[in-house]
């Protein structure tokens, strides 16, 4: 059975570091990837050389995959914190998850704007995949049962 924390005399620990981060996130986390105009980026992409495009695409694919991985893998941490009743940390981590989701949207929007729809996982190194596709999810999933 869940026990409500904020409805008790304890309330919220408004002076705690996680709660202050939560307040800061509400103030400064107001950007929207869908509102960014990538028209000039698309033109610059077309003007870039093949070598430049390959380098940029490799970087974009790493950012895209990394942001998506963090978006997916933060939930077990939030669940573990919630089970411990650390509401202020949970509140902050939900804003962190929201920002990671926006990063995922941002990089996908960039890729769409420049017309890149191909299989980007092919550009990721084996060591990158090991960290973000194997180690990170396995480690974070342990938080659910540990």
What are the roles of these predicted feature ranges?
Residues 1-146:
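Non-heme di-metal
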């Amino acid at each position: 059975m869940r026990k409500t924390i904020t409805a008790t005399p304890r309330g919220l620990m408004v002076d705690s570091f996680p709660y202050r981060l939560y307040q800061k996130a509400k103030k400064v986390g107001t950007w929207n990837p869908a509102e960014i105009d990538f028209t000039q980026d698309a033109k610059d992409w077309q003007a870039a050389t093949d070598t430049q495009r390959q380098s940029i695409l490799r970087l974009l694919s790493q950012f895209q995959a990394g942001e998506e991985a963090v978006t997916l893998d933060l939930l077990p941490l939030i669940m573990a914190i919630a089970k411990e009743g650390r509401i202020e940390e949970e509140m902050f981590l939900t804003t962190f998850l929201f920002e990671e989701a926006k990063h995922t949207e941002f990089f996908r929007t960039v890729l769409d704007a420049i017309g890149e729809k191909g299989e980007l996982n092919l550009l990721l190194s084996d060591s990158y995949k090991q960290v973000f596709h194997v180690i990170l999810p396995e480690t974070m999933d342990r938080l659910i049962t540990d």
